[in-house]
Amino acid sequence: VPMALAARMEKEHFQINLWTGASTGDEEDGALARANGIKFRMPYQTNKDMRNAINSGKIDYCDLHLSESAQLARYGFLGGKIDVAIVEACAITEEGNIIPTTSMGNSASYVETADVVIVEVNTTQPMELEGMHDVYVPLDPPNRLPIPIVKPNDRIGTPYIPCTPDKIKFIVPCDIPDHTRALGEIDENSRKMSQNFIELLHKEVAAGRMPKNLLPLQSGVGAVANAVISGFVDSDLKDLTVFTEVIQDGMFDLIDAGKLSFASGTALSPSPEGLERFYKNIKEYRKHIVLRPQEVANSPEIARRIGIIAMNTAIECDIYGNVNSTHIMGSKMMNGIGGSGDFARNAYLTVFFTVSTAKGGAISSIVP
């Protein structure tokens, strides 16, 4: 649907407001940006063409903490209601309920609030994905209740996105596979960061401030974050749990090594090789993974309750401990804050990783 929409935009020259869960593939963010078809974008992106259009002022961009984006959409604070929700699915039940694929994001809230729902049934996604989701949308004030999760493997919702047949106006078959990005090789700097961090965790356990299997881990996205989490494979730590936003290759490594008992997230974002490995071993991985709406996966309430260990990457940080995760040279948007603010401000232990310099040593990552 987004690719067909981009082709129409190039001919008819109109624009839309685009709300997503987080970043999307080039088939959406890239195609629509190149067609000059986006007026407003929120809450996170990683596409080069989208980023360039945002930084040049062609696209208005709202950089949000990801835990807040769904509720702000429901409240109507982002410029009105949702007209059309496009959701990828591997199946639709007879009752109209939607079985998501490898990402939950904000889909449940968008389906709930949209006037029209379009479902893309992706035939490249395995039916074994059914049952891997736990869909729970919190009530809005004044009726909001605590989100009843006290450990990563708790299930509190449904394995589908609730919907009704009358709301689904179009069903579009799709055979485009997930196009994920390659992760960088684990270099010596990343390996050393991981070793230093694991040494710190051992000291915390020895001091009695953490249990032997630690507290639930949260890991950001990207090559450095993936390298750090992969370092746990060679440690003597075991029976680990994860409560995070995005699940990458390193967590598959931990499951394969018997070190990770359970991982909760909102999306899978592995490398192409990691995605192939997931599909090949999905019957085993589904025992250890649950995907939730990002309003729950990124919930500051839950992060603080279960006491996560937050591990994220930084563009730069200052000597007072302030961290910049969003802007280059103070004014150019990179991707966005994403979920790092949700987790870092509410974790039991907060850690940011960065190499000491950027641009081949020309720019310091540590600033006054």
What are these model-derived regions, one by one?
Residues 1-368:
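Conserved alpha/beta enzyme-core scaffold
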